[in-house]
């Protein structure tokens, strides 16, 4: 369990310029959470605080009752896996197999057993046929699936997905969201997804909505995403709009998805 209490953060150490303001939230073990919000809402900064990359000026974070601070940082980080928007910096091996194996370096098994473990992890993300491929030559969606397999190899209790589908084409998004859905069903890990992707968010047990550095709503995804007031305050796209934009981009990949979403959002506001 992760308990966040009265967390405030400023990049300038100025409490009058807070990016996050009095954040209070509890993440229960085995649940899947989606954190939604517009650009600049504070959600990505929050993910870096959860993973120990940033330290808040005020408030505290506890992981299974242990305070996240300088003394406990190494211990807690072993419980947390994080996958970033661009996975290229996470690749350390010449092949997909090497990358997954690197995360298993502390496991003492005979080579045959290790090969089976790696194959099983690759199969979880539908990459078992790519073990001998070089990561840099994979598609964006395939790279993210390899990054997920490498994090799963570490067997963390908590996995943070930081905007992992935002740079992917519709097919890549679909493949990665399918993996997230499979992980969600497992119920053995706490999953926290920082996302703009409605298809990710709707799968969550709970959605947490950020706006202007604070949490403005938390609860059941269907209730949250069907609440017009929350959608407008958070400046996020409704699932209906996202589905239309994804469908149009499949038909014509040259569409600018962000521009398309903006136009569809304006159209929906006029017809609501």
Swiss-Prot record:
One of its GO terms (cellular component) is ATP-binding cassette (ABC) transporter complex. PANTHER family: ENERGY-COUPLING FACTOR TRANSPORTER ATP-BINDING PROTEIN ECFA1 (PTHR43553:SF24), HEAVY METAL TRANSPORTER (PTHR43553). Its main location: membrane. The gene is ecfA1. It is a peripheral membrane protein. GO terms for molecular function: ATP binding; ATP hydrolysis activity; ATPase-coupled transmembrane transporter activity. This is Energy-coupling factor transporter ATP-binding protein EcfA1. Residues 2-237 form the ABC transporter domain. InterPro entries: AAA+_ATPase, ABC_transporter-like_ATP-bd, ABC_transporter-like_CS, ABC_transpr_CbiO/EcfA_su, ECF_ABC_transporter_ATP-bd, EcfA_1, P-loop_NTPase. It comes from Mesomycoplasma hyopneumoniae (strain 7448) (Mycoplasma hyopneumoniae).
